[in-house]
UniProtKB/Swiss-Prot annotation:
Keywords: ATP-binding, Chaperone, Cytoplasm, Isomerase, Nucleotide-binding. The gene is groEL. This is Chaperonin GroEL. ATP binds at T29, L30, G31, P32, K50, D86, G87, T88, T89, T90, G415, D495. Forms a cylinder of 14 subunits composed of two heptameric rings stacked back-to-back. Interacts with the co-chaperonin GroES. GO terms for molecular function: ATP binding; ATP-dependent protein folding chaperone; isomerase activity; unfolded protein binding. Together with its co-chaperonin GroES, plays an essential role in assisting protein folding. The GroEL-GroES system forms a nano-cage that allows encapsulation of the non-native substrate proteins and provides a physical environment optimized to promote and accelerate protein folding. CDD domains: GroEL (cd03344).
Length: 545
């Protein structure tokens, strides 16, 4: 495929047009009075959103050079969203500002490499300032509610729901988002450990109305192989039955012959028993069975540990206050495992979460941690139409991820104030040469831009507000929602420190790459020849024998 090449100022100018096209579409969504963006869909209703990364992901430009520039900034938005869960619009605004200021200086003859070094030095100082400004959230659910409210586009209902969900399942708990059947947004909480495996036979059901098998204080047998020979199973089945307590069997599988025997015994002798398949697959299954054992105070009967099924004793069985098994799920409530063992297991999983680089593995580990530490909350998002539903789910997702970021690194004053306060940390900073010092000045100017844009979206004059906020101290800032200058923490206008930090780091990283770019290579568009028209009079082949 043939390529086209552009160099120097010409290349950077084309890239900047793409940067501006994307950034201008994204930045209208910033702040409490940010506007909506409507995205046309080929099928179904258009998507209305105020989520920066959703807007960014939809943008593809026809000009290849400009599209390359747009994709650079799209990377800023999506990476910030992945790392911190929010701050995608802020990152885009910062990237555009750094690129615009930097490009002026590079065009005037400054050294791009020195400017980049100056930018990197300034960003490191600002990040330190943000970390010093950060205030830990701890168990203060009012602060958690404030963060969630701001990230959900100042929707106090969503903020309260997320704070309530965290109260119920703890800060480590899993909170998932699903679509509600009606228009109300509500919380559902699954207490205890739930895994997605149901009963192996409907004959195990004890509550025919709900089609569930309900067990009070059952023994729980945890086996990592298939039960195919009932003879091996009898030594543990008999004492469990004699105790008069129900028995839940969790195994890789149960052979049809063994299952039939269990069902017949269940029906004839009112033996309270239920069999379910073990959750997960491969190594993850082994870990999940170990989790269940720790939670219930039992032992995984595994040949890897030198334990065979026929050697199992009643002391090896786990137990819990209640177990409910439906067609699709098994829920274990109040397992009898020792608290210190559960805590130790949770700490192991937290260490694995910190070490893993795979997003999928991290998600699965967090699910396991939540199931051990408290339970799972489900936010059922309700709306009047499909369009509103998508927009609301975006906001709930933003708020939830921002809240997790706040718990991780604390909160700072919102509304762009944290960046304004960080400018002081750059006052004494000098580069090794004039161009490095210019790079520092670029960051000084660029970190005012989020506040300017929030104010502009609220219909006010940015320069005036930036000046007034700069003259203030501490958490003093401009609340665009109420059009009042006040203490941002007291007003509940707060941002997660992690979001503020990551947005700037990612913006500066891409802007630095942009400014040090000297050549752009794109694929040359081939002019496709038009399809030839069919010759007239070729409609049929009449007269042929």
């Amino acid at each position: 495929m043939a390529k086209e090449i552009l160099f120097n100022i010409e290349a950077r100018d084309q890239l900047k047009k793409g940067v501006d096209a994307l950034a201008n579409a994204v930045k209208v969504t910033l702040g409490p009075k940010g506007r909506n963006v409507i995205i046309e869909k080929k099928f179904g209703a258009p998507h209305i959103t105020k989520d920066g990364v959703t807007v960014a992901k939809e943008i593809e430009l026809t000009d290849a050079y400009q599209n390359t520039g747009a994709q650079l900034v799209k990377e800023v938005a999506s990476k910030t969203g992945d790392d911190a869960g929010d701050g995608t619009t802020t990152a885009t605004v910062l990237a555009q500002a750094i690129i615009a200021e930097g490009l002026k200086n590079v065009t005037a003859g400054a050294s791009p490499m020195d400017i980049k070094r100056g930018i990197d030095k300034a960003v490191a100082k600002v990040v330190d300032s943000i970390k010093h400004q950060a205030e830990k959230v701890g168990d203060n659910y009012d602060k958690i509610e404030q963060v969630a409210t701001v990230s959900a586009n100042n929707d106090p209902v969503i903020g309260k729901l997320i704070a309530d969900a965290m109260r119920k399942v703890s800060k480590d708990g899993v909170i998932t988002i699903e679509e509600a059947k009606g228009t109300d947004t509500t919380i559902g909480v699954v207490e205890g450990m739930q895994f997605d495996r149901g009963y192996l036979s409907a004959y195990f059901v004890t509550n025919t109305e709900k089609m569930e098998c309900e067990m009070e204080k059952p023994y729980i047998l945890i086996y990592d192989k298939k039960i195919s020979n009932l003879k091996d199973f009898l030594p543990i089945l008999e004492p469990a039955v004699q105790s008069g307590r129900p028995l839940l069997v969790i195994a890789e599988d149960v052979d049809s012959e063994a299952l039939t025997t269990l069902v017949v015994n269940r029906l004839r002798s009112q033996l309270k028993i239920c069999a379910v398949k073990a959750p997960g697959f491969g190594d993850r299954r082994k870990e999940m069975l170990e989790d269940i054992a720790v939670l219930t105070g039992g032992v995984v009967i595994s040949e890897e540990k030198g334990l065979k099924l026929e050697q199992a004793t009643i002391e090896m069985l786990g137990t819990a206050d209640k177990v409910t098994v439906s067609k699709d799920n098994t829920t274990i409530v109040n397992g009898a495992g020792a608290k210190e063992n559960i805590k130790e297991r949770c700490d192991q999983i937290k260490a694995q979460i910190a070490a893993t680089k795979s997003d999928y593995d991290r998600e699965k580990l967090q699910e396991r941690l939540a199931k051990l530490s408290g339970g799972v909350a489900v936010l059922y998002v309700g709306a009047a139409s499909e369009v509103e539903m998508k927009e609301k789910k975006d906001r709930v997702d933003d708020a939830l991820r921002a809240t997790r970021a706040a718990i991780e690194e604390g909160i700072v004053a919102g509304g762009g104030v944290a960046y304004i306060r960080a400018i002081e940390s750059l006052d004494g900073l000098k580069g090794e040469n004039d161009d490095e010092t210019t790079g520092i000045a670029i960051i000084k100017r660029a970190i005012e831009e989020p506040l300017r844009q929030i104010v502009a979206n609220a219909g006010k004059e940015g320069a005036v507000v930036v000046q007034k906020v700069s003259e203030g101290k501490g958490d003093f800032g401009y609340n665009a929602r109420t059009d009042v200058y006040e203490n941002m923490h007291a007003a509940g206008v707060v941002d997660p420190a992690k979001v503020t930090r990551v947005a700037l780091e990612n913006a500066a990283s891409i802007a630095g790459m942009f400014l040090t770019t000297e050549c752009v290579i794109v694929e040359k568009k081939e002019d496709k020849p038009e399809m030839p028209m069919g010759a007239p009079g070729m409609g049929g082949m009449g007269g042929m024998m």
